Amino acid sequence: MDPSVTLWQFLLQLLREQGNGHIISWTSRDGGEFKLVDAEEVARLWGLRKNKTNMNYDKLSRALRYYYDKNIIRKVSGQKFVYKFVSYPEVAGCSTEDCPPQPEVSVTSAVAMAPATVHSGPGDNATGKPGTPKGAGMTGQGGLARSSRNEYMRSGLYSTFTIQSLQPQPPLHPRPASVLPNTTPAGVPAPPSGSRSTSPNPLEACLEAEEAGLPLQVILTPPEAPNQKSEELSLNPGFGRPQPPEVKVEGPKEELEVTEVGGFSPEAVKAEQEVSPSEGLLARLPAILTENTAQVCGLSTSTTEITQPQKGRKPRDLELPLSPSLLGGQGPERTPGSGTSSGLQAQGPALTPSLLPTHTLTPVLLTPSSLPPSIHFWSTLSPIAPRSPAKLSFQFPSSGSAQVHIPSISVDGLSTPVVLSPGPQKP
């Protein structure tokens, strides 16, 4: 017998064989009922077939319950060890030549058993249950749905849909790639970034910067075409000028544009070179470009007004800790440079990276003399500080006022404004 035979096929073959009457026998050939005369022996034979030596009737009966839902075998109520073939009512009267094809058809699935009954018998004449046509109908519908799904998967519509969903985005990248090499065949990343910043849609410019910005990093002397591009940037400072505040990333690019226009001094170019860290930060271009376009879109200043404070703003931030008089009375006039520099600083701390140390490194800005006043600052908050003899000898240089006000710029990083008073330190 085939080793892949199922349990109901195994019982059916035992019933067909003549020498197994002492273990299993028919009780009603017309109704398809049979009885397990020796249930443990039948279970042992089934265990030998499946290479399970510990098979018993309890496990066999649980296996037979699986066929209850499949409408193949049913337990006859009120009679012990008596079962009934529901889908094979005339299987007892069939001959040996007609019966073997039935189990072979149903090896794959129990539901596929029903079409085999169509050839063996017209239906259940005893009970009148049309189980065979119902099973055949279910098999036909399942096969129909399965074939339609396979046809859909093989038709190419599924794969074509997913590929076409990605189609609209790639044409955005070859378009600027074809336009940018025309203006600058082997240009620096500055002209591509300038053309992206002048585009009306900043989101599209950010997407173009991710794909088309990196492959064009070839540093060569550009031809006369970048002159026209830099002139367009000088005519449109509203969108073309977000790059100069971002000196940390856009330093090398602006240096090339400044030298092409010719309206800047070499000192300003050197100042931008000192501030810019390296060209390796070009990977952060999309996030910075989006942030600048959202914040500095309304800024309209000339190129000279933006570059000149860039030259002098860095030393002023460094000179602020070295001048004690600034802490005394020049809080609002921290940068006595030009009105444009104060206007740029008024836009917010996120405009220029040079202002970030002002807010994040507050203890560095609170060092006006050789003795660090940060220690003195925190000692005033301590209840033990007035009793310390080391702190009685030092006081803030004041211009006759009883209180020393720290400038608002230097304490923006703190949560609350702090006023230092040398009064509690006097004995």
UniProtKB/Swiss-Prot annotation:
GO annotation terms (biological process): cell differentiation; cellular response to gamma radiation; cellular response to lipid; cellular response to testosterone stimulus; gene expression; hippocampal neuron apoptotic process; liver development; lung development
Mod. after translation: Sumoylation represses transcriptional activator activity as it results in recruitment of HDAC2 to target gene promoters which leads to decreased histone acetylation and reduced transactivator activity. It also regulates nuclear retention. On mitogenic stimulation, phosphorylated on C-terminal serine and threonine residues by MAPK1. Ser-382 and Ser-388 are the preferred sites for MAPK1. In vitro, phosphorylation by MAPK1 potentiates ternary complex formation with the serum responses factors, SRE and SRF. Also phosphorylated on Ser-382 by MAPK8 and/or MAKP9. Phosphorylation leads to loss of sumoylation and restores transcriptional activator activity. Phosphorylated and activated by CAMK4, MAPK11, MAPK12 and MAPK14. Upon bFGF stimulus, phosphorylated by PAK1.
Cross-link (Glycyl lysine isopeptide (Lys-Gly) (interchain with G-Cter in SUMO)): K229, K248, K253
Positions bearing Phosphothreonine: T335, T352, T362, T367, T416
Polar residues composition-biased segments: 300-310
DNA-binding region: 5-86
Gene Ontology molecular function terms on file: chromatin binding; DNA-binding transcription activator activity, RNA polymerase II-specific; DNA-binding transcription factor activity; DNA-binding transcription factor activity, RNA polymerase II-specific; double-stranded DNA binding; mediator complex binding; RNA polymerase II cis-regulatory region sequence-specific DNA binding; RNA polymerase II-specific DNA-binding transcription factor binding
Family of this protein: Belongs to the ETS family.
Protein name per UniProt: ETS domain-containing protein Elk-1
